[in-house]
Amino acid sequence: MTKIINGLSDVLDEYDVVLIDQYGVLHNGTIPYIGAVDCFNRMIQAGKQVILLSNTSHRSCGLPIKLGPMGFSTSFQGVTGGEVCHTYLLERPDTHARCSLMTSDLDGKVTKRASNPESTFHGLGVEIVPLDKAQFLMVDGTQQICYSDRVTEVLPTDYRHTGEVNDAMKEFLRGGLERKLPLLCPNPDVLAVMANDRFVHMGGGIAKLYEEMGGEVIYFGKPMKEHFEVCLRMAHVTDKSKVVHIGDSLHHDIQGAKNTGVDSIFIAGGVHARELSVNAWGTDEKQLRVKPDLLENLLERTQLDPTYTMTRYTW
C-alpha cells in the first residue's frame, strides 16, 4: 500500500533522477500550485537531475517558456509527447506527408509553423489535406477539424468543454476508419484540470474512441514505456531504483512509472482531487488531508499502487 508523505523532502534523498509532470503538479495551466515553485527550485538546488515529462502536444522547447515566467527554475531537461511525435514524423517523410487534423489552433500550429518552434509541425513538410488524400489522422487538440491549412475552412468543435462528439468529429473518425488510416495522438490525456479546478476534455479521449471503433492509434506520451525510457537515456540511468516519477494521473503517470519499473509519487490534489475529496488550494488540514479509505478505494479500482502519495507538490 502506498505511503502518505507530508512533502518531497521526506523521500528526496532516496533518488538521483526526478521525472516530473507539469499540469496538475506544478501548475494548473495559468498559475503555480501553492508551494510548487519553492519545491521545484529546492529540488534542483539539491543537485537532482530533473526531467520534465509532459503529455503536452507542444515540443519540449516550450517548457521553459511556460515555466520560467511562473518562477520555476529552467535548469531542467524536457520530454513531451509533441517532441516525440515530431521526431516520429521527421523520420517518415514519405509515409507521413499528408494528414487530416484535429487541433486547437490551425493558424499557430500549422499556418505559422515556420515561426513557431513549439509546433509539432515546425520544420516539417506535412500537408493538411481532405480525408481521401490523407495518409494519417492526427489529434493534437480538440477545438478544430482541418482538411486544409486555410483558417477560414476549419470546422469548430466544443469537445474540449463538453466532451460531446459532434457530426464533424464523427465524419472525421469514420472517414479515417473507412480508409484504415492510423491516428497519431501526441497527448494521451483524456481529462486535464485547469484554472478554477475546471476539467477539460483532451485528445486522448478522441484517440480512445477511434480505438474502440476499431482504428489504429499511435500514442506519444505517458503511460507509454517508450516515453519514459527516452528520459532514462537522457539521464544516463544505470540504476532504476534511483529514479522517481511525480505525477497526478494514476492512468498516465503512475501507470507509466509502473510500466517502466521506477518508483512514483502520486499527487492526490490534481486530476483525481474530486474523487479523493482533497483541495490542493486549501489552507486547512481538513481540505489537505488525504483520506486513507478514499485513496485505498481508488487504488483498488485502478489496480495501481504508487510508492508514495501526497496532496500537493510541496517541500
Regions found by a protein language model. Name each.
Residues M1-Q45, T56, S60-Q77, H86, ...:
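Asp-based, Mg2+/Mn2+-dependent phosphohydrolase catalytic module
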